[in-house]
Amino acid sequence: MKIVTVNDYDEMSKFAAKIIASQIILKENSVLGLATGGTPLGMYKELINLYNKENLNFSKVQTFNLDEYYGVSDDNPQSYHYYMKNNFFKFTNIKNENINILDGTTSDIENECKSYDNKILSSGGIDIQVLGIGENGHIGFNEPDINFEAKTHLVKLDEKTIEANSRFFNSKNEVPTSALSMGIKTIMQSKKILLLANGEKKAEAIFKMVNGKISPEVPASILQLHNDTTIIIDKAAAKML
């Protein structure tokens, strides 16, 4: 586990974008695992800058998103389909057929999840998986006490996660209570993992992930066992290390 401490959010975002860009330059048909939420927004903005100013080419890149709210349609502004399109995809030359995001409106959850895992495998596996971390130590929507052997599945969202995500909605009551998410096993099969965190609110989760015992109570602690994980955090998130 490599830890990179930077000064602030902007530096974190640019550092992460450079790692992603280097991967794409090295392998033009790279497979990227992508995350949503507030943390990676700056990274996406910087990748768009690299596309516009340095001709970073996304035309052969494949992407798989970590998760999607269950019961939320693609065109809903709160969906992660909408987030990815409007914060990243539509500003690059990535091809629609290379974009993979779980279907939150599926009537066959088991098949949707199984097909997603199979498509990741058939693509050759994820080259770099981008992660954030929740205040409760979740990665993706893998909440505390998750089964480390779980693949992509339906999860019930933790109360802390619902509270944290309520800032994106008009009220807490509008936040979905479940989601489809890559499982820990799916995430751990990624060749490289890039975890981003900023702010003092994430400091305790970062400490437990890095220095705590490996336990389902802190899902991110499993990353101690991954052989190529880079943690990029600002000084505030690193304050307990």
Swiss-Prot record:
Gene3D superfamilies, sorted: 3.40.50.1360
CDD domains: GlcN6P_deaminase
Catalytic residue positions: D67, N136, H138, E143
GO MF term list: glucosamine-6-phosphate deaminase activity; identical protein binding
Keywords: Carbohydrate metabolism, Hydrolase
Function: Catalyzes the reversible isomerization-deamination of glucosamine 6-phosphate (GlcN6P) to form fructose 6-phosphate (Fru6P) and ammonium ion.
Family the entry assigns: Belongs to the glucosamine/galactosamine-6-phosphate isomerase family. NagB subfamily.
Designated name of the protein: Glucosamine-6-phosphate deaminase
Organism name: Clostridium acetobutylicum (strain ATCC 824 / DSM 792 / JCM 1419 / IAM 19013 / LMG 5710 / NBRC 13948 / NRRL B-527 / VKM B-1787 / 2291 / W)
Source taxonomy: Bacteria, Bacillati, Bacillota, Clostridia, Eubacteriales
Protein's gene: nagB
